[in-house]
Swiss-Prot record:
Subunit text: Part of the 50S ribosomal subunit; part of the 5S rRNA/L5/L18/L25 subcomplex. Contacts the 5S rRNA and the P site tRNA. Forms a bridge to the 30S subunit in the 70S ribosome.
Record-annotated disulphide pairs: none
The protein's role, per its UniProt record: This is one of the proteins that bind and probably mediate the attachment of the 5S RNA into the large ribosomal subunit, where it forms part of the central protuberance. In the 70S ribosome it contacts protein S13 of the 30S subunit (bridge B1b), connecting the 2 subunits; this bridge is implicated in subunit movement. Contacts the P site tRNA; the 5S rRNA and some of its associated proteins might help stabilize positioning of ribosome-bound tRNAs.
Keyword tags: Ribonucleoprotein, Ribosomal protein, RNA-binding, rRNA-binding, tRNA-binding
One GO cellular component, as annotated: ribonucleoprotein complex
Protein name: Large ribosomal subunit protein uL5
Pfam family for this entry, one: Ribosomal_L5_C
């Protein structure tokens, strides 16, 4: 079992229950899933781009990504309905906890010119979204084999009802928010 999951069960649940005055431990917010999304507009012209992005995402997440397709045709972007334009992975359970551990302790500290995560990136319902500009911050990606530096969106979905509860949950995991 992931260390972060044990830490959550043993320490964070008790802290948050005390802080917010929950009557039951089942009311304490928990992380439900982490979604990684990589939008690849250039995949329309070159299919190899999508394959490379899928390989990178498989290495980062530890599971095969799903190819996302265009829902509508947009002439301005030269895409038609059904064209592959990205890939995404939804992590739950054990893989989610292991990824979160790697994200907090290894990947985020490797970001260049890092000044902290934006505390305003909560959506109002207790979910947090962040962008990563380069996939090479993850140790699983070999810098020499990368054809192009790509970014991705990381969304952390929690069971929290408010932003304050979600912020307290992520703070308990030592997320490096800006002060």
């Amino acid at each position: 079992m992931a260390k972060l999951h044990d830490f959550y069960k043993e320490t964070v649940v008790a802290e948050l229950a005390k802080q917010f005055g929950y009557k039951s431990v089942m009311q304490v917010p928990r992380i439900e899933k982490i979604t990684l999304n990589m939008g690849l507009g250039e995949a329309v012209a070159d299919k190899k781009v999508l394959e490379n992005a899928q390989a990178d995402m498989t290495a980062i997440a530890g599971q095969k990504p799903v190819v996302t397709v265009a829902r509508k045709s947009v002439a301005g972007f030269k895409i038609r309905e059904g064209y592959p334009i990205g890939c995404k992975v939804t992590l739950r359970g054990e893989r989610m906890w292991e990824f979160l551990e790697r994200l907090i302790s290894i990947a985020i500290p490797r970001v260049r010119d890092f000044r902290g995560l934006n505390p305003k990136s909560f959506d109002g319902r207790g979910n947090y979204s962040m962008g990563v500009r380069e996939q090479i911050i993850f140790p699983e990606i070999d810098f020499d084999k990368v054809d192009k530096v790509r970014g991705m969106d990381i969304t952390i979905t929690t069971s929290a009802n408010t932003n304050d509860e979600a912020r307290a949950l992520l703070d308990a995991f030592n997320f490096p928010f800006k002060k």
